Amino acid sequence: MSDYFSSRPSQTLTPMGNKPSGGGGGDDASSIHSKSSQYLMDILPDSMTLNESVSSIVANNQAKEFILPETDERSPYFINVPIPKAQPTSTTETKKPLAGDEAIDGQFVKEYPTDILVDRFYKWKKILKGLVIYLREVAYAQEQFARINYQLKGSVKFPFLTDIDETTNTITDPFTTAPRGPKKAQPAQKKVGLTDSEQFQMQMQQEQQENAVQAPTDESKMSLAPHEYKPVQTTESDNTSAASGFVKFGSGSIQDIQVILKKYHLSLANQQFKISKEITSTVIPKLEELRKDLRYKITEIKDLHGDFKTNIGAHIQLTSQLLKKYIAAVKFMNAHGIGNDRASPTNKKPHKLDPKHDPYLLKLQLDLQLKRQVAEETYLQEAFINLQSSGLQLEKIIYTKIQHALLRYSALIDSEARLMIKNMCQELQHGIISKPPAFEWDNFVTQHPSCLLNWKSNDPIPPPRKVSDVIYPHMKSPLAKCIKAGYFLKKSELLPTYHQGYFVLTSNYIHEFQSSDFYNLSSSTPNSTKSSAYSSSVSIADTYANANNAKANNHHRQASDVHNSSTTTGGTAGANGIRGIRKKSYLAPIMSIPLNDCTLKDASSTKFVLVGKPTLNENADVRKSSSSTYLSGSSQASLPKYGHETAKIFSKAPFHKFLKGSKPKNKNTKSSELDQFYAAAQKESNNYVTWTFKIVSPEPSEEELKHFKRWVQDLKNLTSFNDTKDRIKFIEDRVMKSHRFKAGHMSRNSVNIGSHTPCLTDSTFTLQDGTTTSVNLKGRAEKPQYIHIQNNSLADFDGNGFRSKVNTPAIDDYGNLITVERRPAQSPHQYSDYMATSGNTTPSYSSGSRPQSMYNGYNPAVSITSNGMMLQQSTANNNTNPTTNLRHQRNISQTSSLPGFSYTSLSLPVNSPGSSNSESSSGGYFAIPLHGNNNNNNYTQRNSEGSSPCYNDDQIRQQQQPLQMQPLSRTSSSSVNVTAMRSTSAGNSITANAPVVPKVMVNNQNVKTVAADQSATAPSSPTMNSSVTTINRESPYQTLKKTNSTGNVPCLTAEKTHAHPAFYKRGNNSAQNLTTSSSTASRVHPIRKHKKNVSFSSLNSLMFSKKGANHGGNLMTNQFMSGGIQEDDGDSTNNDTIKLNQSIYS
């Protein structure tokens, strides 16, 4: 930089004190101040200089008489350069900066050209020093950031997800790649031609191995060994799943998270290392070099201090005197000419003009002085120009160097920031953040059809298969229909004492069973809550069985052993979660009376007499089975008033097991009685016997008597046939005709279910005598013409459709016996509280097989049958619609879930009970009950603070409403309990003006689901009305909307949110922001502090990449502006290598 300042001008001006080389004795000063020129000075006025306030026009007019002011550029007194003030020599040395370039604080800078510039460039020097110190710290910090990011990369441990190899940057699958042991660090001198990233990674690996000894044991325990996880077997055609079971890599699934995080930290560590090396090796050295040069330039500026010493002031004073003398000489000549020595009247002091005062000579002297003055002024001006031009160039160089350093620094920091957004934010936004929450689950379910249902999150809950859906040969045969079933007391000629039995009337037989639970396969153990009255009634049989166990024949003992083993096996399997299958069916009746060999001999209001040939079950222990229901005269009084309770009290175990009685009997007495009973039963077998049947209740009611009368009528009609084919044809034809002809009449005159109890043969539709029929009567009298079944109110009756539904299958989905009649006969004590079913289906608990204790004290309002879920109505219920069917309400915990919107639709499938819509699932897998509430008796409305009321299906109606956005929080602990129901039967109607779901509270916020003028009250009873509608749970998740913003993480914002102070607020509102409770404590990991005195040898020993910097030349290159980001990573030829700075989705 030697060209910063030019040397002093070569020409030299004549000093002001030298005499001119031309003639003339003495200098100008001596000639001016001589006494011989005093006569000229007396002619001049006191001031010849014009006032500065005179305008330029006046100055031009008076320029011939007066001198222009010194501010005018044409004035001889004008100076166009500032005149430096000379400093005393005594103080100059004391105020001179010290050798150590330390400025004196608390004083102003001297107003001298060189001093002011020295001070300015000294400050620039300090700025450069501070900038170098800052950048050196930045380089150190970036190196430490790179180390931290490399350590963070090592903390990303997902042993079963796709990984990235640290050395080759290739994608590896832990289940398909053979595990490799830890690589040993190779000596640095053996590695030739390594890139900066490889050297840095190798150095980081060495440091991690050194720090592994000092690592806390907690972190080592967090790592999981790869052998603890096994790959998931997928189908051969599956190309969407990885070995871990998640969606394959590159699909935006969780499978990508390990590669994204490791790639992010690895690329960021490499970039930070490049930034540190770039600052240390390029930016800082240039600033240090500039600062060193500036030190020399400050010294050169100080050497120009003498160039600003001048006597321009003395020149101006001399010019002023010569100018005045010249003007006086000109005026003297104009007034007197040359003049003379004689006095005259006009010239009292005569004086002759001295020749040396000739105006020419004076003007020549004045011009020479002006020339010297201008030369001095020019010299001073050139000194200023030299100093200022050099200072300008120097400051421009300093400023440009600082600009380039800061520009490079900002480009490096910008590249780091863009790398964060590119390799982290955008990768996550294009990947897992943009996927729906059930993305992984749907793929997981579809890839395992052998062990999971093919049920996606957006699909409705698959309906369970009903027994009525099963098809098998002759499933609708009239031979397999149950006409009636109920309890009676029976005695015969050989058994004069009445005993109770459960009798089933079919198309061909009258079967006697121990109890109404004879078909219940799930009953295997006695109920511990049986009443003592029934226990006492069978105590004789139980004692006899225990006393004579050794006398039992081998056949009976083997049958008992087989059945006991099957029961034990079934119980053990049930304990293991698998339902056992019985090896031997115990549905064989105790006794069967064929209708072909049976005749109704006599009948009264409470009794009827049958004559027939019974058939005993060969595989059953007749003695034990019969004695189980044997009632002595003394024990008959202890019969319960309600015979229907037998289903709850009699054992569900096989027939050879009996309940122990509460009153001990004499052993010999009981043995004789049972021996007599057994002998009588053997005599009755295959012989014509006369039985007497009567009502169980000792004091039957009017309704019981009517029911008994229908039994008598049906027996009379059916026993009139002695051929099975004729009887079956008769039953089927009369059933079809009854429903065909009476469908219209019954639709117009609906019968009140609470006051009328229809059965197989109603009083108005009994077998008529004397009518013609096409059936071959075979000589038997009083053969019926048709049997009428109470039909439903369908106006258009379809015989084939009805035929496909009647009495198929034999038991309903609830495990109850199905009869042909509208509701089966049951124990008389149940009539007052009986709740009839609607339609052509059988009610639940017709035989007393389902104890009411299961329902916490109230009768269930819905029964499940093969034709659907039916409503049961009480006699007190005035809302009677015999054709309205309801879904089944299970006795399970109420669903606690989120409110959704419903559409009016009859054809949409309905989800399973106990669940409601969860977010983004539309009633799919995520509609899982969150909270349980087994108390069905208290259907009360919850407190409005943070809770929502319970609903019952009789108050839930569908209305088509516009979609509204509702505030919602995933951390909600309260939700809406909706009673789930199954699909209804065909023919249901929607109540258009029914009330809708009321306003609820979610997270202490109002959720508006209905209009302002609509309201509904919470039900106080779980009993359902007959008119209900389907809750549509297939509507999409309508409480949140997705807001996309450029460059930001997608947000989920809630509309009309009135947040409670405790309401959880989410920063990004992501779908997918998985929220945590505010009370959840954040996990704090120990952080190792980096020592400040770490050596920079690791940076100085590594060469910067040839692509990372531009040494010399133009700094504005593409590499410079890109901040050092290498898109190809120097590895563009290897297709198997992942690019650290490129998206995995590109």
Curated annotation (Swiss-Prot):
Q: Which SUPFAM superfamilies match?
A: PH domain-like (SSF50729)
The residues covered by the PH domain are 482-606
What GO terms fall under cellular component here?
A: cytoplasm; plasma membrane
Gene Ontology molecular function terms on file: channel regulator activity
What's a single GO BP term from this record? cellular response to oxidative stress
Q: Which InterPro entries match?
A: BAR_4, PH-like_dom_sf, PH_domain, SLM1/RGC1-like_PH
The record's keywords, sorted A to Z, are: Cytoplasm, Phosphoprotein
Task: Provide ranges: composition bias, Polar residues.
Answer: 1-15, 939-950, 969-982, 1132-1146
Question: Which intervals carry biased composition (Low complexity)?
Answer: 564-575, 912-924, 958-968
Instruction: Give a short account of its post-translational modification.
Output: Phosphorylated in response to various stresses. stress-induced phosphorylation is partially dependent on HOG1.
Q: Where is this region: Disordered?
A: 1-32, 171-194, 553-575, 835-854, 909-982, 1124-1146
Record localization: Cytoplasm
What residues bear Phosphoserine in this entry?
A: 344, 793, 944, 969, 1070, 1095, 1098
- Give residue numbers for the modification (Phosphothreonine): 808, 1017
Functionally, this protein is described as follows: Positive regulator of FPS1 glycerol channel required for the glycerol efflux. As a component of the RNA polymerase II holoenzyme, is required for SSN8 destruction in response to oxidative stress but not heat shock. Required for cell survival in response to heat shock independent of SSN8.
Family, according to the entry, reads as follows: Belongs to the RGC1 family.
Q: How does it assemble?
A: Component of the RNA polymerase II holoenzyme. Interacts with RPO21 and SSN8.
Q: Which PANTHER family match?
A: ACTIVATOR OF SKN7 PROTEIN 10-RELATED, CYTOSKELETAL SIGNALING PROTEIN SLM1
Official protein name in the record: Activator of SKN7 protein 10
User: Which species is this UniProt entry from?
Assistant: Saccharomyces cerevisiae (strain ATCC 204508 / S288c)
This chain is encoded by the gene named ASK10
